[in-house]
Amino acid sequence: MAETNTSNIGFEKQIWDAACVLRGNIDASEYKSVVLGLIFLKYISDRFEAKYQELVAEGDGFEEDKDEYTAENIFFVPENARWSVISAAAHTPEIGTVIDEAMRSIEKENKRLKDILPKNFARPELDKRRLGEVVDLFTNIQMIDHGNSKDILGRTYEYCLAKFAEQEGKLAGEFYTPSCVVRTLVEVLQPYNGRVYDPCCGSGGMFVQSSKFIENHGGNIKNISVYGQDSNPTTWKLAQMNLAIRGIEADLGKFSADTFFNDCHPQLKADFIMANPPFNLSGWGQDKLLDDVRWQYGTPPANNANFAWLQHMIWHLAPNGRIGMVLANGSLSSQSGGEGEIRKNIINADLVDCIVAMPSQLFYTTQIPVSLWFLAKNKKQKGKTLFIDARKLGTMVTRKLRELTDVDIQRIADTYNAFVDGTLEDEKGFCAVVTTQDIARQDYILTPGRYVGIEEQEDDGEPFEEKMSRLTTELSELFAKSHELEAEIKERLGAIGYEL
């Protein structure tokens, strides 16, 4: 038996690299459920085993009593689904079938997981030898830190979601929002308690970051109630597993469903709504919802659902509720399809609290520039809106991908908090507080760059006339050098028979 490795360092990447050998010819979108399902199975097995051994040590014979586990929000794992059984079958041709049966048994014993877990490990195209090797890897690494709610499996699940998003490109938009974007929404909204809602929740990232925020600030996760839904059945299942790993109780509806046509929470009035809806969604069914009660500020156009999502969220706001959402930049200024009028009505209703223009290249899934919209039913700064131009923030972590740093996120959150407190001073090129009347004078366009102005450049102290004289001299020298090089190139081309 290999020695158990309890180190957290690089564990997420280790799991990912090992699991990648399983892929073979399976599409990334299908393979995702295999990898994440296996992580989930190991997680619930480890939690169950820890409690099981605790009950054995007590000596009262309650180790097979299901109630002992459910009382502590631990999933009960029947005998044929325990990791010892999986591990023993790792190097047999039946390993896929054994895992599928384990998943079915766990679903049967835990109603919350009914029809959620993947049961496709026996498929012929999944290499059983490699599957056994990954099972071995999981067997030899302890996946939870006992007594610590911030377990390594949650991080691994999150890491693998990000890697799948990177692989799937545009398709990943259905289930993944970059962590730094979600953290920015959460740090601004600060959802300490109340009802938290995401109408297009993907894999549940908004809820996970909310729980992390609460933990980091010494709060209690039980002080929030989580509601969400998603129209993609695979993504909906990913969210259920993701939240279960984190110990987050959530109502995501009884099944996946279209938010516009089958609202799973029609009576909900939420305190915090966070979402990253599909950008510029066309063909969303506007013609069948023309008289919907949610369109208080105007009927959204058929070819773009951005303001349908926005108004759906406003409809679900509690009297003191707040929204933080991601929208494509077109929504800041578009006049087509009545969008300008809808935006005008929302602004005049004094709902727009803050707009943040985000940097480019934050998403694996799209190059469309985006902004964060923060709305509030009962704004503290009446008749005013904060504009933040954060386009220059962030650091390139790969050639194609940018991330906001902790410092960047905190700067945005601190700026917003100062605005709410009434202590913020405008900063040229970064932030400005603007009255609704001034926004009206700009035809209700919400592009931050229009209001924050251009960052002031430090004066280097060199007199203008001297600077221009120096620069024109340098330019003249460069022109002269250019002519010399041009003549030399012509001469060399002529020497080999190519005259210009």
What does each model-identified segment do?
Residues 1-192, 251-264, 357-360, 382-398, ...:
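Non-catalytic, mostly N-terminal accessory regions of nucleic-acid modification and defense proteins
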Residues 14, 21, 30-43, 236, ...:
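Conserved Class I SAM-dependent methyltransferase catalytic core
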Residues 25, 284-304, 330-339, 359-364, ...:
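Short, contiguous acidic/charged loop-to-helix segments that flank catalytic cores in large enzymes
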Residues 124, 146, 200, 228-232, ...:
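Hydrophobic alpha-helical scaffolding
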Residues 171-275, 280-296, 328-330, 338-352, ...:
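Conserved S-adenosyl-L-methionine
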Residues 215, 244, 248, 278, ...:
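Hydrophobic alpha-helix feature that most strongly marks membrane-spanning transmembrane helices
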Residues 269-270, 304-306, 320-322, 326-328, ...:
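Active-site lining segments that contact anionic ligands and/or coordinate catalytic metals
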Residues 351-352, 362-413:
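C-terminal, active-site-flanking charged/polar segments
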